């Protein structure tokens, strides 16, 4: 599958006239709980030709391919990426932490990895993750029966918040790492481990009666984290000059001698 993904990325480069500098897995496979039928959620960063940056019109800055045969591919243009990086965008920071790298060219991703600790804003990340958990509770966990996979759409962001509270660093993508570090209560952890195994076996769409210990944990932690988040201080870090240089240097590096 990796070679097929690389072939698709090369096709995108040719079709759109861009250069891809980084492509990773960002979905359940990167989170450590894929099933046999899980999509490959490929996310990439790309650089258009120099002329793109000199247009007076705002050009489209995303590429989205139709989902086909378990392959879900989309990407962000570099300037958009850097603007989001400056805001400590959690999905982007996760991309830069992914253990499943499908493609990396030039020096862009390595430079971003070196800067990500400086860019990380705990307050922004906690609010991102806890609001994701709240939305997903509303959308997926209201009934008396719940699809197994939907629990993880709530549990992972809650554990990400707990990680930030405890360590003050970017949370790891792998759910098992988060769970083993943060979940101490035996009954709760056992239920999570059971769900994890069932998810990996392909039972992710099976309906499960509400698991009280998990729902209690979710309700308690969402309320607690929302209160705790009010005490977090927004950090003001201006990385504009540094990221402007990275943008300019990357465009020059990628399209030197016509980008051949």
From Swiss-Prot:
Protein name, per record: Uncharacterized protein YcgL
Q: Which residues form a coiled coil?
A: 214-252
Instruction: Tell me the domain of life.
Output: Bacteria
InterPro entries assigned: RlaP (IPR018775)
This protein's UniProt keywords: Coiled coil
Q: Which organism is it from?
A: Bacillus subtilis (strain 168)
Record has Coiled coil as a keyword: yes
Origin organism lineage: Bacteria, Bacillati, Bacillota, Bacilli, Bacillales
Protein's UniProt keywords contain Coiled coil: yes
**Which PANTHER family has this protein been placed in?**
NUCLEOTIDYLTRANSFERASE
């Amino acid at each position: 599958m990796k070679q097929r993904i690389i072939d698709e990325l090369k096709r995108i480069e040719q079709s759109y006239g861009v250069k891809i500098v980084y492509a990773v897995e960002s979905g359940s496979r990167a989170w450590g709980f894929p099933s046999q039928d899980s999509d490959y959620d490929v996310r990439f960063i790309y650089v258009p030709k120099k002329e793109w940056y000199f247009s007076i019109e705002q050009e489209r800055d995303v590429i989205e391919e139709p989902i086909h045969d378990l392959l879900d591919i989309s990407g962000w243009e570099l300037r958009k990426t850097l603007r989001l990086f400056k805001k400590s965008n959690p999905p982007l920071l996760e991309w830069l932490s992914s253990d499943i790298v499908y493609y990396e060219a030039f020096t862009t991703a390595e430079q971003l990895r070196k800067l990500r600790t400086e860019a990380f804003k705990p307050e922004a990340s906690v609010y991102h993750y806890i609001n994701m958990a709240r939305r997903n509770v509303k959308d997926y966990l209201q009934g008396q029966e719940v699809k197994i996979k939907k629990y993880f759409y709530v549990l992972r962001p809650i554990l990400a918040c707990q990680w930030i509270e405890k360590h003050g660093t970017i949370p790891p993508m792998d759910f098992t790492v988060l769970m083993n570090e943060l979940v101490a209560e035996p009954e709760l952890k056992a239920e999570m481990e059971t769900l994890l195994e069932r998810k990996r076996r392909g039972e992710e769409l099976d309906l499960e009666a509400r698991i009280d210990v998990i729902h209690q944990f979710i309700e308690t932690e969402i309320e607690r984290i929302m209160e705790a988040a009010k005490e977090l201080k927004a950090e003001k870090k201006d990385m504009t000059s540094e990221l402007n240089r990275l943008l300019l240097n990357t465009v020059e590096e990628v399209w030197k001698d016509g980008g051949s």
